[in-house]
Amino acid sequence: MMDRRSFLKDSAGMAAAAGAVPAVARAQPGGAYDVAVVGAGAFGGWIALVLRERGLKVLSIDEYGPANPRASSAGETRSIRSGYGAQAIYSSWAATALKMWKLRQAEFGRTILYPNDRIELANAWSPSMLAQRKIFDDLKIPYEVLDQAALRVRYPQMNFDDVSFAFIEKSSAAVIKARESMIVVSEVFQKKGGAFRIARAVPGAATGRHMTTLKLNDGTEVAAGQVVFACGPWSAKMFPKLMGRKVDVYRSEYYYWGVPAGDDRFSWPKQPAWHDHIVGGYGFGSIERGLKYSPAALGRVAQDPDTAERLATDYLLKRGRDYIGHRFPDMRDAPILETRVCQIEATADDHFVIDTHPDYDNVWLASGGGGHGFKHGPLVGEYVADRLMGKATDPETDKLFRLASRPDLQPTGAGAA
Ligand SMILES: Cc1cc2nc3c(=O)[nH]c(=O)nc-3n(C[C@H](O)[C@H](O)[C@H](O)COP(=O)(O)OP(=O)(O)OC[C@H]3O[C@@H](n4cnc5c(N)ncnc54)[C@H](O)[C@@H]3O)c2cc1C
């Protein structure tokens, strides 16, 4: 693996060849960092850790702290799945990321991963599901297809009266403790010599196409050779002109139902994760907090990640109760024990934005996780570190994640065009 000395030497070489001295190649004056990463969520947290592990001097900054309750990475749990319809890149990324999470779990020495079946309930093979089945065949990812009768035998706690079949992911799916794992990532980052600060950061001074400092809300400035903005749902607030028409930030709610006493049918590992292509929504078996279900929202409600109240919406609570009673008859009268309101930061085509800032050669943008970015954290960390350190990456992936490749969109709640 490239260490800091050889990286600086190589970068200087590359820079000399390119006739410019990239930021990190310049020995950082005094207390300057090689890299400052703004945002300690699933994207920024992993980017900072991987860069630190590669020997760089890294500062991780978050205005509210890692996995803070406003952040999209702060949910108790998130799902890891390889089922992505026709989007093969995310199927293979998810399969790789799952392997990385398993290694990290061993390193962290605590249980954060809960492997389970993931069932997609359907009545017809949509083009997206047909494409997914082919991708699973091509990537040799194991799966099963069970009809209604077989589903009733395998998962008797669920009602399949309106379901013809299910596509079942076997070894490529898991539930991950999201909030907990992001706190561990930040702890391990600091244990490995990374610096962490709670502060709101904005772009600071610049010389030509080189941003030299970040300005912090306490009036101080920090210098860094390179800067990564991994601000998730705050990216459009940070760069309104650049990101304002590229990402949409809207609410997403889910709730936890209390399982019956002494009854483990609705809990991991007996209860699989599921995605309902018929009624809508998805959920996981209980891991500590209850049976989780997120009803389909039937439309987007814009959300300001700083100021929005995280209180559940009545009509979605009703949709959730009706659904649980339908899909889990023995849970019809179960109490809702907890509710969560989070925000999704999605691009028009649901692809990530990982690219340099158009005005600065040493500034990186890493966001656009949408409703699916958490699982990819470890791989996003490696990928961005490779890009930032000038290591070869897949040009097709680079192109896919380019900011300019994202279609413009009309953000939810924004005034009519
Ligand atoms: C309800 C819901 C369910 C989801 N389910 C899944 C799932 O099952 N599987 C999956 O893989 N993904 C899922 N996702 C998506 C996933 O959670 C996100 O894609 C991912 O967490 C995004 O991480 P992030 O680091 O980009 O953003 P965040 O986690 O929001 O992190 C951004 C951080 O930047 C900080 N920040 C912002 N601006 C500044 C600033 N100026 N200065 C300092 N700090 C700043 C914030 O405090 C925040 O901590 C879900 C998302 C939601 C909302």
Which residues does each PLM region occupy?
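C-terminal catalytic lobe of FAD-dependent flavoproteins
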Residues: D330-A417
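Active-site substrate-recognition segment that forms the wall
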Residues: L49-E53, G109-Y114, P233-D361
